[in-house]
């Protein structure tokens, strides 16, 4: 199964509370943090919610 590499590129300080919670759920705390998650619909939905704060790329 492929994986997603998710990197936070913008701060979550001046965002909606649910966006901050989504960043925390993904395991992102500060700009430049990167996590590797399985490519599942749940994670893609979270990334879609905060797409203006993160970048995503597929890795094997």
From Swiss-Prot:
Q: What is this protein called?
A: Large ribosomal subunit protein uL30
**Which family is this protein grouped under?**
Belongs to the universal ribosomal protein uL30 family.
Subunit note = Part of the 50S ribosomal subunit.
* Protein source organism: Cutibacterium acnes (strain DSM 16379 / KPA171202) (Propionibacterium acnes)
Q: Which GO terms describe its molecular function?
A: structural constituent of ribosome
Q: Which Gene3D superfamilies match?
A: Ribosomal protein L30, ferredoxin-like fold domain
Q: Which domain of life is it from?
A: Bacteria
The reply on keyword Transmembrane helix is no
**Keywords from the UniProt entry:** Ribonucleoprotein, Ribosomal protein
Cellular component terms per the entry's GO annotation: cytosolic large ribosomal subunit
Q: Which cysteines are cross-linked by disulfides?
A: none
BP term (GO), one = translation
Q: Which InterPro entries match?
A: Ribo_uL30_ferredoxin-like_sf, Ribosomal_uL30_bac-type, Ribosomal_uL30_ferredoxin-like
């Amino acid at each position: 199964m492929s994986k997603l590499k998710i990197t936070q590129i913008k701060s979550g300080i001046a965002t909606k509370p649910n966006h901050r919670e989504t960043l925390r759920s993904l395991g992102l705390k500060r700009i430049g943090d990167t996590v590797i998650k399985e490519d599942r619909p749940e994670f893609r939905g979270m990334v879609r919610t905060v797409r203006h704060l993160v970048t995503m790329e597929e890795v094997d």
